[in-house]
From Swiss-Prot:
Reaction(s) the record says it catalyses: cytidine(1402) in 16S rRNA + S-adenosyl-L-methionine = N(4)-methylcytidine(1402) in 16S rRNA + S-adenosyl-L-homocysteine + H(+)
Name of protein: Ribosomal RNA small subunit methyltransferase H
Coiled coil: none
GO cellular component terms listed in the entry, alphabetical order: cytoplasm
Main location: cytoplasm
Family membership: Belongs to the methyltransferase superfamily. RsmH family.
Name of a matching Pfam family: Methyltransf_5
Organism: Lachnospira eligens (strain ATCC 27750 / DSM 3376 / VPI C15-48 / C15-B4)
UniProt EC number: 2.1.1.199
C-alpha cells in the first residue's frame, strides 16, 4: 500500500477551493478528479449524515488510495472509476439529478509523475506509457511510433507550445525508422538533438513541452475538459458552484471561455436593442481573475506554481 502514502501530497489551492465550494453539510458534491482525495477529504469532513460526496477517477491507483483515505466517511462517500466526462451517466446511475458543487483538478497528479513505471516522467528511464486510465490500450509509445510527422508537429506545437515542434517531429520520425522508440530516455535523446545547444542550456528540461503534448493528446485532456463544462454547469442546483483548477494556459483558456459563454450566451449582434436569440444566462463567473497560490503555498509546494482556480455559480 506504499502508493497510498505517496498520494498524500498536499492538494493545490486546497483552502481556496473548499472556501469557494460553499459547502452545505447536507449537500451533494462531486470531485471529478479524485486523485488521492486531498480535496475530497476536506469536503467529506464538512458533510453530515445527509450530505453526499461522489468521487470519480479513471486511475486504478487513485481509486485504491482514495478509498483508503476516505474510509472514515464511507457512509457518505461513493467512489466510481470513470472519466469525469461521463459524469452525467455516473449521476444518472446513482439516481442523482442535481448537485451543489463540482470540483475538477486537471492534469497529471504528483503520484503519476513520481511513479516511474507510469511513464509520465522524463527524469527516469522507463517504458513510454502516460495513460491516466490503464484500461486504455494506446500508450505514449504507440503514439510516438505511429503518428505521422504532421500529426506529431501539430500536437507538439499546439499542446506543448514548443517553438522547435517541427524539428522534434522530424527527428522522432527519422529515429523510429531505425528502430521503434521504446523508453523515456530514448525519446529524451531525440528531443535533445532537435533543440539548439544554447537554448538547451537556458530553457529548463528540453523534453518538458513534448511530454506535456503527448500526455494531453493520449488522454484527450483538452477535448474532455471542453466537452464537459456545459454538462457540469447544467447539473448544478441554483447557487451550486463549479470549481476548476488548471495548470497551464491551454486549459485555463478553455475554462475562461466556457464560463464566460455560460454567463453570457447571447449571440445577437451588439447593435440589437434587445436580445432575440433567446439564449439565457446559466449563472455568473465568480472569479473575474483566476485565484492563484499565495507565497506560503508556493514555498511549500513548487508544483502549485502554475495553478489557477476559476469558479462559476449557477443561478
Amino acid at each position: 500500500m506504499g502508493f497510498i502514502m505517496e498520494f498524500k501530497h498536499k492538494s493545490v489551492l486546497l483552502e481556496e477551493t473548499i472556501d469557494n465550494l460553499n459547502i452545505k453539510p447536507d449537500g451533494i458534491y462531486v470531485d471529478g478528479t479524485l486523485g488521492g482525495a486531498g480535496h475530497s477529504y476536506q469536503i467529506a469532513k464538512r458533510l453530515t449524515g445527509g450530505g453526499r460526496l461522489i468521487g470519480i477517477d479513471q486511475d486504478a491507483d487513485a481509486i485504491a488510495a482514495a478509498t483508503e483515505r476516505l474510509k472514515e466517511f464511507e457512509e457518505r462517500v461513493t467512489i466510481v472509476r470513470n472519466n469525469y466526462c461521463n459524469m452525467d451517466k455516473v449521476l444518472d446511475e446513482l439516481g442523482i439529478d442535481k448537485v451543489d458543487g463540482i470540483l475538477l483538478d486537471i492534469g497529471v497528479s504528483s503520484y503519476q509523475l513520481d511513479t516511474a513505471s507510469r511513464g509520465f516522467t522524463y527524469n527516469v528511464d522507463t517504458a513510454l506509457d502516460m495513460r491516466m486510465d490503464q484500461r486504455q490500450e494506446m500508450t505514449a509509445k504507440d503514439l510516438v511510433n505511429t503518428y505521422s510527422e504532421m500529426e506529431l508537429f501539430r500536437i507538439i506545437r499546439d499542446y506543448g507550445e514548443d517553438r522547435f515542434a517541427k524539428n522534434i517531429a522530424k527527428h522522432i520520425v527519422a529515429a523510429r525508422k531505425e528502430k521503434p522508440i521504446e523508453t523515456t530516455f530514448e525519446l529524451n535523446e531525440i528531443i535533445k538533438a532537435s533543440i539548439p545547444a544554447k537554448v538547451r542550456a537556458t530553457g529548463g528540461h528540453p523534453s518538458k513541452r513534448t511530454y506535456q503534448a503527448i500526455r494531453i493528446e493520449l488522454n484527450r485532456e483538452l477535448d474532455v475538459l471542453e466537452n464537459s463544462i456545459d454538462m457540469m454547469i447544467d447539473r448544478l442546483n441554483p447557487q451550486g458552484r463549479l470549481c476548476i483548477i488548471t495548470f497551464h494556459s491551454l486549459e485555463d483558456r478553455i475554462v475562461k471561455a466556457r464560463f464566460r459563454n455560460n454567463e453570457n450566451p447571447c449571440t445577437c449582434p451588439p447593435d440589437f436593442p434587445v436580445c432575440v436569440c433567446g439564449k439565457k444566462s446559466k449563472g455568473k463567473v465568480i472569479t473575474r481573475k483566476p485565484i492563484v497560490p499565495g507565497d506560503e503555498e508556493l514555498n511549500e509546494n513548487q508544483r502549485s506554481k502554475s495553478s489557477k482556480l476559476r469558479v462559476f455559480e449557477r443561478i
